[in-house]
Amino acid sequence: PGLETFLRLRIGDAGKLVAAIDAHPRYYASLRRLTPKLEDQVPRIRDTLRRMRTLVPDAVFPDVYFLVGRMNSGGTADATGLMIGVEMFGRAPGTPLDELGDWHRAVVGEFDNLPAIVAHEWVHFQQRARIDGQPTLLQAAIGEGVADFIAELGAGRHINQHVHDWAEPRAAALWEEFRARMDGTDYAGWLYEGANARGDRPADLGYWIGYRIARAYYERADDKSAALREMLDNQDFHAFLAASGVEREFGGH
């Protein structure tokens, strides 16, 4: 079921997968020596999910599928379970990254990041927001940021450190830009641009600002367990933003 779902949601069809392999033949070939090491990550993934159960005791734990995709998704989740694209975690000594474009070179991670991406998609599986139509930039960014923040609590890291490293020195200016656009549905410059990112600006800054909102909300909460449940059940994103107090962290009032 996981392969069928990943094919539908992320790969598209066999021709698109073949095209990705043809465009990066040495990179895909290098995955053969890494995929047997996936088994080495299973204990760490299980430990991470056990910590997630401690954080959210009433959570659901779906099946996890590890698949080779077409370099466009590290993971996704739906009712089938969690689908992880292992080709996005092929960074290792000797990996031929020269075949990859700038965005892929920035985002391709190591196998050690697999527990964090599993945790991130696990959070998406738990989220219960009901949104009619396309989410606003605010809604989408908080959804992704909550997933990164809770994943970090369980896995000890999140999957977007390179984005944080770029964004933090520019935090105040980015907040002003985000605030002006957060109620629209244009994600350009903030989310899901992948290889279409412009210049040195990372493609997924929305993950960073959503993480900052989630972290601020959690740190201000007296009841941390209740705060985690509120993050997962959130239906009022403007109220969540206001309660986080994050604007003051960015120098606002």
Ranges and model annotations:
Residues 73, 170-173, 235-238:
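Amphipathic alpha-helical surface "interface" segments used
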Residues 20-160:
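Acidic/His-rich structured neighborhood in mature extracellular/periplasmic domains
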Residues 65-66, 166, 228-231:
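Beta-strand segments within the central parallel beta-sheet cores of soluble alpha/beta enzyme folds
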Residues 1-25:
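N-terminal mature-domain "stem" immediately C-terminal to a signal peptide or N-terminal signal-anchor/transmembrane
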Residues 140-141, 168, 207:
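An alpha-helix initiation/capping motif
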